[in-house]
Amino acid sequence: GVKDIYFVVGEQSTQVQSYYRSNIQLNDYLRRAGKEDKLPLVAPLRDVRIHFLTQPSTGGYGTSIPVGLASEFIKPGESAFVVMGDQFFWRVDVGSNAADLAELVEARGLSAGLLGNPVEEAFIPQTGIIETDEQGNFVRIIEKPKLEEAPSNLSNSSFYILNKEIFELARTLPANPQRGEFELTDAINAYIASGGVIAVGEAKGDYMECGSPSGWLQANNAMVELEKN
């Protein structure tokens, strides 16, 4: 299982660190209020080590930067989950997309994988769609294809298992010449071009996108409704 979690945070970030550390004031309040039963809900995670890496405010920008910062902590032969912080999946069946993807990667004898999120036809021309080969492994991402030309209904969910080679590519590749950003998809494409193979799994559950105000509000409203039920 996962024993170490690395959060890549901004230079002025404190919220994530505070959330995952013990809050003495909150603990004292719960005890005074007779709500000791709530203490386990705010306790730090057990049997796992939390690490924080700071992404400099100056320098490169893009999705490969935090992956490159974490590369030194990945040993040769190791793989690690990489999940972007502005999205998650909610599964009412209490299943785990992470566990499902790890099982798929292991079953295929590979060291890397990614999750595709099934989307409705109306959204296919608005997003990047994953193309796979006959074995269900990654070929490429086609940006905003026409519905009739889309190779699948799976969009990239930015949920990965990456090996040391891809971490190093994320650390060393230059910025994308068209967009000027350091993009993780460039590292993935370079790995494929070198003969690497990446499994593609299909995500289950509701996809919650929190990278925009409307998406963040929708995710919070969904959680409130679940609490009511």
What function would you assign to each model-found segment?
Residues 1-7:
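A short, N-terminal amphipathic alpha-helix
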Residues 2, 21, 75, 193:
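Short conserved AdoMet
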Residues 9-13:
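Residues in the short beta-alpha loop(s) of Rossmann-like NAD(P)-binding domains
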Residues 16, 26-29, 36-132, 171:
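Conserved beta-loop-beta/alpha segment of the NTase-like Rossmann-fold superfamily
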Residues 30-33, 181-182:
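A short, aromatic/hydrophobic, helix- or strand-capping loop or linear motif
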Residues 81, 95, 99-106, 137-229:
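Catalytic-core segments of class I nucleotidyltransferases/pyrophosphorylases
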